[in-house]
C-alpha cells in the first residue's frame, strides 16, 4: 500500500496512506495487521485522516516493509 511518512522519531513512525477516505472496517483491518508485525509495541489508526502511528522496537526497515505489504484485499478479520 502506498504511504508517506508524516513524522518520525526513534521507535515511532506516523504514516499517511494514499486513499480518499478510510472506513472503520478498513481501520480495524489495518490495526489488526500492524499489531501482528514483529517488533510492534503499540498501534493507533486514525480513520478520519487515513494515518497510523506505530510504536516499535527493532528494525525501522522491517516495519516500513511490513506496512508496504499491507492490502485490504489480502487481509481478513476472523
Task: Please identify what each model-predicted range represents.
Residues 24-26, 64:
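Solvent-exposed, non-transmembrane alpha-helical starts
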Residues 2-3, 38, 53, 65:
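Residue-level marker of intrinsically disordered, low-complexity segments enriched
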Residues 7, 55-60:
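Noncatalytic linker/hinge segments flanking ATPase motor cores
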Residues 58-77:
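Charge-rich, low-aromatic oligomerization/scaffolding segments with amphipathic character
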Amino acid at each position: 500500500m502506498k504511504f508517506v511518512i508524516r513524522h518520525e522519531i526513534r521507535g515511532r513512525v506516523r504514516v499517511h496512506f494514499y486513499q480518499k477516505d478510510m472506513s472503520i472496517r478498513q481501520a480495524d483491518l489495518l490495526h489488526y495487521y500492524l499489531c501482528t508485525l514483529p517488533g510492534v509495541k503499540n498501534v493507533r489508526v486514525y480513520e478520519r485522516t487515513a494515518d497510523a502511528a506505530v510504536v516499535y522496537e527493532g528494525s525501522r526497515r522491517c516495519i516500513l516493509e511490513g506496512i508496504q505489504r499491507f492490502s485490504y484485499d489480502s487481509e481478513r478479520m476472523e
